[in-house]
Amino acid sequence: MEYIFELGKVPEWARNKIGGKALSLDLMIRELRLNVPYGYVVTASAVEDGKIRDKAKEEIRLLESKLSSKDTYAVRSSALSEDGDNASFAGQYETVTDVAAEGILEATEFVAGSADTLRVRDYKNAMSDKEDGIAVVIQRFVKPEMAGVVFTSDPISGRDEYLVGNYVRGEGELLVSGNSNA
């Protein structure tokens, strides 16, 4: 496949096309050997102006046919400027959870399209990191009892002497979307 790679097996030449989130997941699996739900990344090269290229759509359809129908999936953004040193983009892009295998293409198109929203453009304009492009992570969905977000520096003060965590019961999307408070 040209546009899709299994997490933990992303070739070195493609790692600059998968965004911070997918790169972190790939490294956790490949180098740290952590128990991370299996998944795939659709590279930023597959997306142009918020739309999935036709060849990439073919690859996603093939992936849909290979995924287990017993599992559901989380389809998440991994923008090239997301989770970087200068900006987190937390909650800016769309996420779709609990997606059946046959809904992966539609969910991927929705997540990729979220890169072209006013909210994301405004956030990006306020940041110094203007790197453009969005990759999409497709990962087996785990239904959590609790989930959260950990910041490696205080998002209010910017101090990095300690970690700041926010947690909610249920899915983390409730927190990052603003639909639930920690």
Question: Where do the model's predicted regions map?
Answer:
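A short beta-strand element within the Helicase C-terminal
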Residues: Y162-V164
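Short beta-strand scaffold segments in enzyme catalytic cores
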Residues: G148-F151
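Short, acidic, Ser/Thr-enriched surface-loop or helix-capping motifs
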Residues: D154-P155, L175
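Short, flexible loop/turn elements at secondary-structure junctions
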Residues: A79, R140-V142, P155, R169
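N-terminal beta-alpha lobe that positions the nucleotide/phosphoryl donor
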Residues: M1-V137, M146
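Conserved catalytic alpha/beta cores of large enzymes that bind or transform nucleotide phosphates
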Residues: N166-A182
